[in-house]
Amino acid sequence: MVILVALGFRLTKRVDQDILVDGDPVLRSASSEAIGRLASLAGTNFLTSQIKSLVDQIVNNRDPYGRAGCALAFGAIYSHVGGLAAGPLLKTTVNVLMSLSSDPHPVVHFWALNALARVINAASLAYSSFVSSTLGMLLKIYLMDSHEMEGGTLANANTSGDFPAYPVVCEIIDAVITVLGPDIQESARTRSLVLNLVHEFSLEEDEGICVEAIKCIQHFLMFAPEHVQIPKLVDSFRGHLSSSRRPLKLASINALYQLVQKDALSMSKLGGDQLVEDLFGMLDDDSSVEGVRTVITSWLQQTVVHNPSAWIDLCQRIMSRTTASQQVADAAARKPGNTRDDEGESLSVGMTQEGAEASSSRLTSRWRTQLFALQCLHNICTIVARSGRREHLDIPFARSLGLPTSGLLVSRVPDLIKMAFTASTAYVTEIRMEGLIVLQDVIKVSLNLSLQ
């Protein structure tokens, strides 16, 4: 039985090694995974012989697809075997993959970089001693023409479009940041090198590179936020919000959410109302964009008790603004024979033709955005009422504290009634229902006032 198992291992190993150098990337990937799993099941002798065999193939086989397959196998073996069992082989693995990462052929260095990222994630803290050499290698790679999107020889330039190196380099930087953790604050040289590389990649025109660079920044902010220029970051993320490239837009939203979660008050000083309006504007353009509502809601929850009036002003502006696309749609809707549109006329019930034309300069925003603004008004009333901040509901008490009443919730009751009543008579059912909810909130606030 033992002999049969051994023969099975040898046969499988031989087949996998033959497929490993195949020109088909799917077969190479499957073969490398199979070798990695075999190494995790077999003993130390198999693991050692497999590593030696891969090194020999890399040295003797100059075929780029074969070298790429061997790089994949190194990554698969280390990730499947684990850091403890494969620890003695980490130095050999890293040296081989770093050497292949500098190979000018796009196929070789792309898969070698991928394998290296996989090894770093699997090794975790055990990789600490290789951080400096890895960052130095990444800096050299960034300066090499062969690793650019259209760099190197003509043949390689045509291939590199399918195997972009820079996004994977960013993934490696991200993995290195995770390995360093809070220790990244101790080495100024390492910290500076990481920040400089990430900054350069964030300026690239390619969408994939920028997205990965943003992820690196997010990880860096977790461990050393005091070494990052937050105002410049906010301006950069804000610029990406209007990008036509959805992944870049979503990455910026996630990064802004992280900053808001960390310190919403500071974000209010940096971004101000305009940044929140920009986020609302994204809902106008595409209500399905993930994360926007989460950012705004988190921001509101953390800051509304300090200045509810400012948030009410913001919601008021959102509910009365327009977009260029709506102006075109509403102009078409005013033509004879056209039916009404929920998107453009959510709060336009009861308006005459003349009234609609007179208010064309202040047309309403899309109804889903209006609905979310109403939900924000509901959150404002609820959060302030539950905060225990008596001054927001008691004018005499606020005056006794010497507080200006203009920023308090109680001073905005008339505006809340107006917005809630207008919404409760809207054309769209969802807005009518939310308007009634806000109206109920206002009644509760007014009831508290009468009991003071």
Predicted ranges, named:
Residues 1-452:
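Extended, low-complexity, acidic/polar intrinsically disordered regions
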